[in-house]
C-alpha cells in the first residue's frame, strides 16, 4: 500500500485542537506530545474497558510494548510515532513489516512528525489498510453518536445520519418532452433515499437508463454482423445545423397537492459513492429516464430530449417542475425536503448523462462527477468516418443500446399499447445512425455535448482510464479541454479500464469528493482545493501525481523508416474466421507481429511523458478505391505493468456504520510482455477531416494525419516503443476481407509524441 493523500486540508493548531476535542479526544494544548498521543491511542480502543491490556499488545519499538513506553520517561520520537501510527492504521508488525522506518518511507507516509496535535489530526484523516480513513473507522464503531445532523471533521461530513431510518419514496416528475407522441408530457420515475430529518438536504442524482432493468434478450437479437465490405462513399461535404436545447415553460399548477409520497420501495440498486454520502446527510436519487420501466416515453438514446427529461428532476428539486405521486397524475407533490443543490454521479452511460446535464447550465446543479462518460456519441460508436465498436462489444450500435435500455417494454401492458409505435421509431433510429457509411451526420451532431461545453456552470470532476477502450479517452479529453477556462474542473486519470475508482486502496477519491461536496452543496467554507489533474503513474504501483493539464503542445518526432512497406488486408478464410470468433486471438497475433501489419520498433533516446494525442503523419496509397488504416502504439518489454482491471481485496470498505460495505480494490502491478499505450482508426476517404469525404484513387499517394486516443504515459530513455499499422481491427472495425493492400512510405512518415 502507498499513501496518496489529496483530501486532507491543512489546519491551524487551534482548529486541530478544537476538532479533536469535539470528537472526544482528551488532548490538551498544555500537555506534552507524549501525553496527548497516549490519550489519543487509549481513545482508539473503544471496545476496551482496560486499555492497559490493549496497549500491552502493541509495541513502541522492537524491545518495548506500548504500555511500558507510556509509563517510562522516554520522549515521543518520530520512530515511535510512526510505528504506533502503523498499528493504528491496521498494519501488523512482523507480518506487514519488520523495519517500520523503511516501511513508512516506502509507503510515502504523509505525516511529518513534529509532536503537534496536527499530527494526530492528520492521522485521523489518513487511510487505514482496510480502505477507510481512521476517523471513518472510529465513527463506524460509535466514536460519536448518530445525531441525524451534520458533524464535520477536516472539512468533510462524518457518518452521523441514521441509514436504518431513511425515507424511501417514489415520485413521477413531469418532463418537458413527449417522446412517444401520445399527447402527454412524459413522466419519469424518481427513486429517492433521504435522511429522516426536518431540514433541507442536498442530493446526489444518478441518471441511469439501467436503473429499473434492461431488455438484454431483445438487444442481443439486434446485434450487428461485423463482417462486410468497407463501402466506397460518394465524395462531398457534410453539412450540419446546431441543435436547439429549448424546453417549453413548465406548468407548475398544483393538482390536489399532497405532502407524502404514495409509493414506497424496499430495495433498489445503488451506487456506493451515493451510499457513502447518504450516511453523511446527502439524499440519493436515481432516475432511469424516458422509455424505461415504470416511466413514460421512448428511449431517445443520448439526445437532448433524454437530457431535458433528466434535467426536469433537478428543476423539480428547485420548484421549477411538477411531480406526481403516481402515473395517474391525480396528486402533485413538491420536494419540500430538498435544498435544491445537486451533484450528479455515475460511470459510463451514467457519467454520460452527467456530462450532458452539465451542458444545460441548469440552476441547482452545483457539481458533476462524470466517471468514464461519453461526451460525443459519435466517438463511442464511430471514428474518423468508420464504424468503430466500443471495446469488447463488436456489433453493438446505438439501436442495440436503445433496445437494451427500452425497459418500458418489459411491462406487458406497455408493450401491448406502445410496441408498434416504438418499433417504427426504432427503425427510423436504425436508419439515422447510418451503419452503411460510418459518417458524422446530424443525428450524431444532436448527441455531441462538447459543442455546448461553454454553457457548463457546475464544478466538474472527471475520472477516466487510459485503458478504457469502451468509452475511449477522447471523450474525457475533448470535454475537459472544451470547458470554459474560468470553470473549476478536475480529472482523475488512472491506468484502468472502464471501472469505478471510489474504493481503491491507493487514493482517497471518495474523501476528496466528500470535501468538495461539502464545499459546493453544503456551503461549508472548508478551504479545500483539489488539483486540476491527478494522474496515476504507469511506472510504479499505487503512485499518483499532480499535473497541470491534459494535453501538451510540445512534440517529439520519430521518423518511421527509410523504405516502403505494405499491409495486406486479406486473410485466409480459416484465419479470418478464427479472428472473427475470438478477437483476442487477433490482438495477440497483432502485437507479436504475427498478423497482417507493418510493425516498427523504436528505442527512446530520452525520458518522455506522453501527454495528449500521439499524431501519425503517413504517406500512404491503396491498391483499390477505398481503405482504412488502424494503428496501435505499445510499450514492449517483459516487465511489470499496471493491469487494467482492479483486483478485489477484502469486503471491508464501510460506507457508513456497517452500511453498504464493498470490496477494497486496486490495479495489480503484474509481469507482462507489453502494454498498449494508444490506438486509432481512419477511413482513407476522411483523410482531410471528419466532415470531408474524398475519393481514393488506386495507387495514388496521399498524406494523411491520424490523431490517436489521448493518454498520459511515462517512458524512460531506452524503453522500447512498437508502432503497429494495419487495416481491419477485429475488435473494433468492420471486418472487410477484401484483397487489397495499403502501402506506407516510411521515409515520408513520422510519429509525434506530445509532451
From Swiss-Prot:
Its EC number is 3.4.14.11. InterPro entries: AB_hydrolase_fold, Galactose-bd-like_sf, Pept_S15_Xpro, PepX_N_dom, PepX_N_dom_sf, Xaa-Pro-like_dom, Xaa-Pro_dipept_C. One of its GO terms (biological process) is proteolysis. One of its GO terms (cellular component) is cytoplasm. It catalyses: Hydrolyzes Xaa-Pro-|- bonds to release unblocked, N-terminal dipeptides from substrates including Ala-Pro-|-p-nitroanilide and (sequentially) Tyr-Pro-|-Phe-Pro-|-Gly-Pro-|-Ile. Its main location: cytoplasm. It is an enzyme of class 3 (hydrolase). One of its GO terms (molecular function) is dipeptidyl-peptidase activity. Keywords: Aminopeptidase, Cytoplasm, Hydrolase, Protease, Serine protease. Transmembrane segments: none annotated. It is found in: Cytoplasm. The keyword Protease applies. The active site is at 348 (charge relay system), 468 (charge relay system), 498 (charge relay system). Belongs to the peptidase S15 family. Homodimer. This is Xaa-Pro dipeptidyl-peptidase. It comes from Streptococcus thermophilus (strain ATCC BAA-491 / LMD-9).
